[in-house]
From Swiss-Prot:
This is Cytochrome b. CDD domains: cytochrome_b_C, Cytochrome_b_N. It is found in: Mitochondrion inner membrane. The gene is MT-CYB. Heme 1 (or BL or b562) is low-potential and absorbs at about 562 nm, and heme 2 (or BH or b566) is high-potential and absorbs at about 566 nm. GO terms for molecular function: metal ion binding; ubiquinol-cytochrome-c reductase activity. Belongs to the cytochrome b family. GO terms for cellular component: mitochondrial inner membrane; respiratory chain complex III. Component of the ubiquinol-cytochrome c reductase complex (complex III or cytochrome b-c1 complex) that is part of the mitochondrial respiratory chain. The b-c1 complex mediates electron transfer from ubiquinol to cytochrome c. Contributes to the generation of a proton gradient across the mitochondrial membrane that is then used for ATP synthesis.
């Protein structure tokens, strides 16, 4: 019989072992769809981003106009821009659900895969932040000013660091130029990290909802999970297209329709919705350095997850106490997201502070305690 080129060719063999003949647990649920959706999001963002970059001018006097020109005069420019802007939202929805799945099912116990995943999240957040600055509207400009200014909280070298990042004494043309360069570069770094992430994942194989080894009865990835992932893709594409075609500006800020003006500060400076939970934690601490540390900790706490796992079972499938705390954590994050979008006024300040304390308490104290208690309950 002639050798199958899919299994013998040096390059196709790698693709085959990663996407076609990959041994996969037979019982992984729809929660395992998000990895492939994130890959599709990344490809879509790189393609739409490249097309937008061909019409974009990274200059503070022309950036706003060039984006406007893309939407008005370029064939389907409006669609490409709307898909790119709302594609970022879909990217974050998928990555947050992907992380939530990892937390619920104990996937973080694959430490290397988990750590590269956290690096991917940080790279994605950096990409989204520098990308938001490029249209050079009011919120772009002031968002860049506020967030880059946080680096000035670093003791001793803070101010120098900020001025080095700005390329001057304020956010200006050099800042925009370098942000464009970074926004172009970072997605390719994300793509490279994704390959590392997958390499580590394929070392151990996928986890599954029961959290038990499934080596004895794995099934090939294709056709079973390729079909399942295409269904997931349809479910993601529907809201994305609905958003991009019917209400493309729903998730954006109206302030960004005004060109950047360093002399006028918007009444409420706030980032895009996917950063609001972290922004709420940042604002809930009345000290600059403390706020910056809490902001960093809110994301970097994910790196501690493997060390906070105290249960004898891997997943939360059969752990009702941990389940309750997990969903409390999700609700808490939604509250933080809401608070981040509100002005710094009376009821919101205290709610934000309580939600921030609850966030860290749930992860660092209550979940490990519940796991230990559940271990004891197993004996009775």
């Amino acid at each position: 019989m002639a050798p199958n080129i899919r299994k013998s060719h040096p390059l196709l063999k790698t693709i085959n072992n990663s996407l076609i003949d990959l041994p996969t647990p037979p019982n992984i649920s729809t929660w395992w769809n998000f990895g492939s959706l994130l890959g599709i999001c990344l490809m879509a963002q790189i393609i739409t981003g490249l097309l937008l970059a061909t019409h974009y001018t990274a200059d503070s006097t022309l950036a706003f106009t060039s984006v406007s020109h893309t939407c008005r005069n370029v064939q389907y420019g409006w669609l490409i821009r709307n898909l790119h802007a709302n594609g970022a939202s879909m990217f974050f929805i998928c990555i947050y659900l992907h992380i939530g799945r990892g937390l619920y099912y104990g996937s973080y116990l694959y430490k290397e895969t988990w750590n590269t995943g956290v690096l991917l999240l940080l790279a994605l957040m950096a990409t989204a932040f520098v990308g938001y600055v490029l249209p050079w509207g009011q919120m772009s400009f002031w968002g860049a000013t506020v967030i880059t200014n946080l680096f000035s909280a670093v003791p001793y070298i803070g101010q120098t660091l900020v001025e080095w990042a700005w390329g001057g004494f304020s956010v200006d043309n050099p800042t925009l130029t370098r942000f464009f360069a970074l926004h172009f570069l970072l997605p390719f770094i994300i793509a490279a990290l994704t390959l590392v992430h997958l390499a580590f994942l394929h070392e151990s194989g996928s986890n599954n909802p029961l959290g038990i080894p499934s080596s004895c009865d794995k099934i090939p990835f294709h056709p079973y999970y390729t079909m399942k992932d295409i269904l997931g893709l349809m479910f993601m594409l529907t809201p994305l297209m609905t958003l991009a075609l019917f209400s493309p500006n729903m998730l954006g800020d109206p302030e960004n329709f005004t060109p950047a003006n360093p002399l006028v500060t918007p009444p409420h400076i706030k980032p895009e919705w996917y950063f609001l939970f972290a922004y709420a934690i940042l604002r809930s601490i009345p000290n600059k350095l403390g706020g910056v540390l809490a902001l960093a900790a809110s994301v970097l706490i994910l790196l501690l997850m493997p060390f906070l796992h105290k249960s004898k079972q891997r997943t939360m499938t059969f752990r009702p106490l941990s389940q309750i705390l997990f969903w409390m954590l999700i609700a808490n994050l939604l509250i933080l997201t809401w608070i981040g979008s509100q002005p710094v006024e009376d009821p919101f300040i205290i709610i934000g502070q309580l939600a921030s304390i609850t966030y860290f308490t749930l992860i660092l104290v209550l979940l490990p305690m519940a796991s230990t208690l559940e271990n004891k309950l197993l004996k009775y």
